[in-house]
Amino acid sequence: MGIGSKILENNIQKSISLGFYHSHSELRKSFYEFFKSKNHEILRSSSVIPDENDGTLLFTNAGMNQFKPLILSSTESRRVANIQKCIRAGGKHNDLDDVGKDLHHQTFFEMMGNWSFNDAFSKEEACRYAWEYLVEILGINADRLYVSYFGGIEKLGLPEDRECREIWKRIGVSSNRILPFVAENFWEMGAAGPCGPCTEIHYDRIGGRDASRLVNIDDSVVEIWNIVFMSSVRDSCGQIRHLGKNHIDTGMGFERLLSVVQNKTSNFDTDVFTPILEKTSELAKKQYTGSLDSRQDATFRLVADHIRAATVAISDGAVPDGTGCGFIVRKMMRRAFLQGISKLGIERYAMSELVPVVASTMKEVYPEIHDTSTHIRKIFNDEEAQFWKTVDKAKKMFDSVAAESKSPIISGRKAFNLFETHGLPLAVTVELARNIGREVDETEFERCRLEAQKVSQKASQFKLPISADDFPSHSDKEKYSYVFRNGKYEFPQVKTRILQVYKDQQKAESLEANDRGFLVLEECQFYGEQGGQTSDTGHLLIDGREVFEVENAKKIAGGAVTVLFGRALLPIRRDLRVEQKLDETRREGVMRAHSATHLLNWALQKLGVGSGQKGSSVDCDRFRFDYSTGDEDLSKEQRTELLIKCEMKMREFIQNGGFTEIIETSLEEAKKIENLQSDVKEDRIGGASVRVVALGSGADVPVECCSGTHIHDVRVIDDVAIMSDKSMGQRLRRIIVLTGKEAAACRNYTKSIYEDLRSTDPKERSKTGKNIDWKRVPIADQARISILLKQKK
């Protein structure tokens, strides 16, 4: 332990007033029991992997994430408390690069919190609950506590929160401990969205002094409880107005509070970390001392944190791979592997021994981690084997690059070439450079990456200053307005009003002919890209004339607003009434493919293939389906045979027919459906309805929660053809499937190959392995055709 830390620890031991010790299990229990006594509903933590429809988050990073629907739309009054698993390792809240350097930053942490939705309890009750729990239940000395409140921002018309100040006085906090702050005590969800003043409780780790001047300045005085009064909303123009309802959102970092009640200056000295650090010390044959001045101790903290975070993420379904949250999990694992071996001397393939320790530490509160620890450990070993294979091969190339120049800076372009050509991740290159006293030009690396990356135009088009509250009359329910009559679909041409026009990413009054821009309609019939389903396309009409070509549509502002992108064919302006005309052929093809996606998921589960869907992308009469293979160890032949059976099962289901049933119900009712394929996400709690889609009739049919558009009769899918199944990395595979007209086209092509190969007239036989387009041949026919080709020879 460093000199500064020793002094702080000694002072704490001299002046600490806590009368008893709390293990992490005891602290959790006391929190739940206290808020249960205050008539709160106790909820389990939701997954650290957010709902797939929430494209704004890589991981659940705050206790309030799961309550977004309740905050934005529900009128239900509720008192709720929980301890939420969180990971901050990407995006706005990113602690990844700070871990190890101090005694408190973590990527995985738990957030204690209680909430009042729609005035379930008052501002004063929230403050009293917090004070009572800290002082009377945990026994924290009130003389160590300071409170801060919002001091007001005059130019924004936000007054000082004097009500809050008076509440703390009534509770018994002396005036010199009630401190006004501005930015520190105004909470915002983002640039636009819910916001409001907050009050915070701060704890002086040393005590026996006036530490009021150190609040929000010195690390010896730490914030332990934040109470947010969510009463306002900031629109896309920066204007703040009343939300129309009052919510209270409170949060306490679990590990930080644990360090307080266990008399520790460091989160890493609490009993959620000490077993992991002790095992790491055993593997490294080195002692962890808790010093801030030791690079070795910083590595201990990094390894303990990253292994813990990756273990939790994998237990919740994350798969280390090259995209999204899987990329961050892989990055954490590989950083722990590299630093654990290179700096602590841990042997290769020993890091997975930390997984059972993490699982055992958290067994009581998160049994799912313990139950899947064997599977998690296998993933660790597989990932480490793949990592060292890459590093050993690419390290020689790095050594060559490093030897080319004596400069202390390694070119970012050369680092990018190592990544692009040899698969050496930037993080590994940076660590290798540090080991020889060099740095990598990461700015140049990023520039090279952006140059090489073909950024999808669609992905970047929809960055508009739009908030969910900007268009209260907007709705996209008309996307479900279609009927199946006399063997075909009918889509009404819905008339509506243009609410807003955007040009060059900014609000505009109008678009001239040939201008490209964005539109928000009042009652939008176009399906906005969401949940893997591609968007509708089509036209807007006035008096029968096409005035705007819709090229794309996407849901933004947290999925609350559907925005159309396209080209004006004639001048149009805001407030015009227009008629919507979908590309019906495209919509029908997408509906067939989306329903077939559910059918494939069902068939795979029935045959025991894989361990669950990881993602999908649905287009017109074709889709891709990503699934986890879990611990499967199948040969190519075995997997192909299973997929052939899967296709047969799907085709049989389609031939038998049956109508689609779609209902909207509450979360609680949806969770009671026994054969529901998709998990009902805990972050969509009661108050928000879910849409349940059942294909066909009977007990054994595909049933999923889904917001997509679907066919009304299973027979309309016509046919399905599984075209390919390939590996996308460790334990992840991708299936490509065609439906409807696309499936029929590949069947006709395959039929022509069979006719050619079976012809008795040599002049009519023209097919060889080289001139067959195998991408147009279903997987079920590829092996048979290969046999016929061999017989032909």
Swiss-Prot record:
The cofactor(s) it depends on are:
Zn(2+)
User: What Pfam family does this protein match (any one)?
Assistant: tRNA-synt_2c
Q: Where does L-alanine bind?
A: 226, 249
Q: Which residues bind Zn(2+)?
A: 594, 598, 706, 710
Matches recorded under SUPFAM superfamilies: Class II aaRS and biotin synthetases (SSF55681), Putative anticodon-binding domain of alanyl-tRNA synthetase (AlaRS) (SSF101353), ThrRS/AlaRS common domain (SSF55186), Translation proteins (SSF50447)
User: Where would you find this protein in the cell?
Assistant: Mitochondrion
GO CC, alphabetical: mitochondrion
Provide a Gene Ontology MF annotation, just one: alanine-tRNA ligase activity
Residue positions annotated to bind ATP are 88, 187, 224-226, 253
| Entry remark concerning the domains of this protein | Consists of three domains; the N-terminal catalytic domain, the editing domain and the C-terminal C-Ala domain. The editing domain removes incorrectly charged amino acids, while the C-Ala domain, along with tRNA(Ala), serves as a bridge to cooperatively bring together the editing and aminoacylation centers thus stimulating deacylation of misacylated tRNAs.
Kindly state the subunit structure of this protein: Monomer.
Q: What is this protein called?
A: Alanine--tRNA ligase, mitochondrial
